[in-house]
Amino acid sequence: MRGEAVQAQQISLTKYLWFPINREGWPFVGLFALGALLLGQIWGPLGWAGALLTCWCAWFFRDPDRVTPTRDGLVISPADGVVQMVGMVAPPPELDMGDAPRMRISVFMSVFSVHINRCPVDGTIVKCSYRPGKFLDASLDKASADNERMSVRMSRADGREIAFVQIAGLVARRIKCDLKDGQQVRAGQRFGLIRFGSRVDVYLPDGVAPLVSLGQSIIAGETVLADLDSTEGARQGEIR
């Protein structure tokens, strides 16, 4: 048992002290590193400050592996962050999913979150739609309608549909989505990122209750947002 505990501790330390960097981040890391070298030629302390910023940039674009639950019917969080809003809202009109409200879970990502986004369920991408817009604070409810966004509609093998939306914010002004119409994806699969903090909304099928609460910290590719096959009602929670 002691040996297993030591091994688990070593794995945990490795996870936090070493992390892969997403390929989207390498150009930024390179620019920060070059800037640090140039600043160091001007004045040593400036070079050290640039080196710290380079390390921060590398950490920002970290892309750790995740252990994704594989049971059918689970809806997995597409983003790291905090549950900002939970409620009934109609999906974006560009997805052609009708005007009827669906349960929406909004996950806010700060500049300290991992910004790699992941698919919430297994299925087929039905439609991807980019919409330019404003860059309001992503924590505002109206950001879902007014801000730049990438909306994705997907269908499971049983025909039930889920939508998720990448929303730009005050700082985040670059949404990247690698998905294409007709593409087959798996839950937990990486599909894109939003640079420097923002929000991802998930729209559940009719009659499905959320299994997360407002203010809850969640992890992309690991935290279960909902269970499509469960009859459990919406979970309640409070900050303690």
Swiss-Prot record:
The modification Pyruvic acid (Ser) is found at residue 198. GO terms for molecular function: phosphatidylserine decarboxylase activity. It catalyses: a 1,2-diacyl-sn-glycero-3-phospho-L-serine + H(+) = a 1,2-diacyl-sn-glycero-3-phosphoethanolamine + CO2. Transmembrane segments: none annotated. Its cofactor is pyruvate. It is an enzyme of class 4 (lyase). Binds 1 pyruvoyl group covalently per subunit. Its main location: membrane. The keyword Lipid biosynthesis applies. Pathway: Phospholipid metabolism; phosphatidylethanolamine biosynthesis; phosphatidylethanolamine from CDP-diacylglycerol: step 2/2. Heterodimer of a large membrane-associated beta subunit and a small pyruvoyl-containing alpha subunit. Belongs to the phosphatidylserine decarboxylase family. PSD-A subfamily. This is Phosphatidylserine decarboxylase proenzyme. The gene is psd.
